[in-house]
């Protein structure tokens, strides 16, 4: 086992705080609409340019072991905040640095670190309660776009794309981010339920220019076995033909005589039909057929429930407004299923997601929820170079998480103002002793720091702006993008409540751990002088006479 260096008290804390400051100073340059870029060297390829706080934090490893410990603890604040809320990493880092810096002054002057931490925790709890009071729901497309824009470093096109995607697929829908093929950002939305199975015969195509079969107001027959004999299908086909509506058949397979008869009837115009294979395999296929049945208001024809094809009636068939069947995909738009039944099914799948152990199962279940709840949207990020693409994609991911957080827990005024307003919940707070009171005052000071940093990055006087914002009320604050004071919510400068809360809680948690640290153990540096390498080879000089051996 390698030897360790053990450092106690102020010596340990001082070094760790140095590490905190190095990391936080690098990260906080990116905060706010006028935050600066950070250039990161790569061992191969060009450097990466980013304005994403967590990307900067992840790159920092310090040579000094104790400094690195401090830096890694604050890095944990950034990454944990990103995991939970998807944004607020830079705010969390700035808050942590401030709590550590102010707290260290009290620790050095002899205050009890444990009571300081208790005071910090009390203040944070009160601030969170105040934030909940300030918060208002985020419901409109405009507000969602504003949250996305702020999180994507004031890129309004990204916010707009995310808002459009959420509007189209709903809050439960799946939104994915992919590399684009052009310079512009693109949004592709798959409405309704899509599954990866296409028509079993090209003779079902009724729109040759698009190579698709489109069925308007069709019935949907769901069967969990193969259909080979047309006699089994005849009773239900006759009923559908009388109704004059088209029919989509989804079964394990349709082959032989049954498929040939369907094709002939389709070509002759007797009954407009299309047949596709059921999606998935094994148990997943049964579950997906059941999903389609609930979405369309039909029943899966299965022997397990005592139903056979011959006994099937129109009541057993699902219905939809429109179905498009391509070579490889089928899209069911506006199924006629009962909304409450769909909601219950979604809840049931959510329970399965929580209980699932493998990531693959979770992903597949999540897809099923999205298909039932609204649809799938793909945002394709456009950029001129690969470096720009990576940087932009990271910002789109951040913005997407932030908008989800906003929809989930509401919004507060941005620009550091929410924390200034939340100070109202702490001002009357008293601790059990003077040390706890000191902990409360540490948090009060720290809650000004994000605003100070935003203003400093914009090149203005932080002290003047902080005093002006504290003197104002409600949503009024300083808009660093325009350099003007005003109602920030009306101007679209808003943050998700969850992001601000998570940043404060995580920052206080790690800062409290640092302040109550009294011993740091790190690996001792290896003694280079002892490693002399190979013994002296001076005696080899006599080999000069070996020339005669040639």
Curated annotation (Swiss-Prot):
GO terms for molecular function: ATP binding; ATP-dependent protein folding chaperone; isomerase activity; unfolded protein binding. Coiled coil: none annotated. It comes from the Bacteria. It catalyses: ATP + H2O + a folded polypeptide = ADP + phosphate + an unfolded polypeptide. Signal peptide: none annotated. Its EC number is 5.6.1.7. One of its GO terms (biological process) is protein refolding. It is an enzyme of class 5 (isomerase). ATP binds at residues 30-33, 51, 87-91, 415, 479-481, 495. Keywords: ATP-binding, Chaperone, Cytoplasm, Isomerase, Nucleotide-binding. It is found in: Cytoplasm. One of its GO terms (cellular component) is cytoplasm. It holds the Pfam family Cpn60_TCP1. HAMAP family: CH60. Forms a cylinder of 14 subunits composed of two heptameric rings stacked back-to-back. Interacts with the co-chaperonin GroES. This is Chaperonin GroEL.
């Amino acid at each position: 086992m390698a030897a360790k260096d053990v450092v106690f008290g102020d010596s340990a804390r001082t070094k760790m705080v140095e590490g905190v400051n190095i990391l936080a100073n690098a990260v906080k340059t990116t905060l706010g609409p006028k935050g600066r870029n950070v250039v990161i060297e790569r061992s191969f390829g060009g450097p990466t340019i980013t304005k994403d706080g967590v990307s900067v934090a992840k790159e920092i490893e310090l040579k000094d072991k104790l400094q690195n410990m401090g830096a890694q603890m604050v890095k944990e604040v950034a990454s944990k905040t990103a995991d939970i809320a998807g944004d607020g990493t830079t705010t969390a880092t700035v808050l942590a640095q401030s709590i550590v810096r102010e707290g260290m002054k009290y620790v050095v002057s002899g205050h009890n670190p444990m009571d300081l931490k208790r005071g910090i925790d009390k203040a944070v709890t009160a601030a969170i309660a105040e934030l909940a009071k300030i918060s208002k729901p985020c419901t409109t497309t405009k507000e969602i776009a504003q949250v996305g824009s702020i999180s994507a470093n004031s890129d309004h096109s990204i916010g707009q794309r995310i808002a459009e995607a959420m509007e189209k697929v709903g809050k439960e829908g799946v939104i994915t981010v992919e590399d684009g093929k052009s310079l512009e950002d693109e949004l592709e939305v798959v409405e309704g339920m899509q599954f990866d199975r296409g028509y079993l015969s090209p003779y079902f195509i009724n729109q040759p220019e698009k190579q698709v079969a489109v069925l308007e107001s069709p019935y949907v027959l769901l069967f969990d076995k193969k259909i080979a004999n047309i006699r089994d299908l005849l009773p239900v086909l006759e009923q559908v033909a009388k109704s004059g509506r088209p029919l989509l058949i989804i079964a394990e397979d349709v082959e032989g005589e049954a498929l040939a008869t369907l094709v002939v009837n389709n070509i002759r115009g007797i009954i407009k039909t299309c047949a596709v294979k059921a999606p998935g395999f094994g148990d997943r296929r049964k579950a997906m057929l059941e999903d389609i049945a609930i979405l369309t208001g039909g029943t899966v024809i299965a022997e397990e429930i005592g139903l056979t094809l011959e006994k099937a009636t129109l009541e057993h068939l699902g219905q939809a407004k429109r179905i498009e069947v391509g070579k490889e995909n089928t899209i069911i738009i506006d199924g006629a299923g009962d909304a409450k039944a769909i909601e219950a099914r979604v809840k049931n799948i959510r329970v399965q997601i929580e209980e699932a152990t493998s990531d693959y199962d979770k992903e597949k279940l999540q897809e099923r929820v999205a298909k039932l709840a609204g649809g799938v949207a793909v945002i394709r990020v456009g950029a001129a170079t690969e470096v720009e693409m990576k940087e932009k994609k990271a910002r789109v991911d951040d913005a997407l998480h932030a908008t989800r957080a906003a929809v989930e827990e509401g919004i507060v005024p941005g620009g550091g103002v929410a924390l200034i307003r939340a100070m109202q919940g702490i001002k009357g707070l008293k601790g059990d002793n003077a040390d706890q009171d000191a902990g409360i005052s540490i948090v009060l000071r720290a809650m000004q720091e994000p605003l100070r940093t935003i203003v400093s990055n914009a090149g203005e006087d932080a002290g003047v702006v902080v005093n002006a914002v504290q003197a104002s009320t409600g949503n009024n604050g300083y808009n660093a993008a325009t350099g003007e004071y005003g109602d920030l919510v009306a101007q679209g400068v808003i943050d998700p409540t969850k992001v601000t809360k998570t940043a404060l809680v995580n920052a206080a948690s790690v800062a409290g751990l640092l302040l109550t640290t009294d011993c740091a153990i790190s690996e001792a540096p290896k003694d280079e002088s002892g490693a002399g390498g190979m013994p002296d080879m001076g005696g080899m000089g006599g080999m000069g006479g070996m020339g005669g051996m040639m």
